[in-house]
A protein has these predicted regions:
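Active-site metal-coordination segments of metallo-dependent hydrolases
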Residues: 1-10, 106, 110-113
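A structural signal for alpha-helical segments
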Residues: 2, 36, 40, 66-69, ...
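Pan-zinc metallopeptidase signature
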Residues: 45-145
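Post-HExxH zinc-binding segment in Zn-dependent metallohydrolases
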Residues: 3-46
Length: 145
């Protein structure tokens, strides 16, 4: 969603500015690694949302048991993607809720929408010269052309 994506992007930039100003470069590097992982997961979510959309687009042509099987295969594929991210990150706990918990349309949809515009707002941050006042002015101008 628009507001959640903006809040996420703005918070990310604010934390990074604060860590730079405090000279906390080790913490900054760790935080930037966290952002990178969040972005990698966001990509997996976006791909999953697209794949699920295709399954439902073709749902009219398939009997209910076939549709159920397609969804189960999709969920297993999504969880495998999450496991692959976790291995890449060398983490034993990352994405635990997604891997071990229930995955359903509502959870996928809400999560992917929540983060979908973060790259857009991050790009606006770059356009603002990485200045909070300029950034907020850019955002205000989006709503009041």
């Amino acid at each position: 969603m628009f507001n959640e994506s903006f809040a996420t992007a703005f918070a990310r930039q604010g934390v990074q500015l604060w860590l730079k100003e405090k000279g906390e470069f080790e913490k900054l590097t760790k935080y930037q690694d966290t952002i990178k992982r969040e972005d990698e997961f966001r990509e997996v979510l976006q791909q999953a949302k697209s794949k699920l959309g295709i399954i439902y687009k073709n749902a009219d042509d398939a009997p209910e048991d076939i549709l159920h099987k397609r969804k189960q295969l999709f969920i297993q594929s999504f969880k495998t993607s999450c496991l692959n991210l976790r291995k890449m990150w060398k983490s034993k706990k990352a994405l635990k809720g997604w891997i071990e918990g229930e995955v359903n349309n509502a959870k996928l949809g809400a999560s992917s929408v929540y983060l979908s515009k973060v790259p857009y707002f991050t790009e606006l941050w770059m356009q603002s010269g990485e200045d909070p006042k300029n950034y907020l002015e850019l955002i205000r101008n989006l709503n009041n052309p």
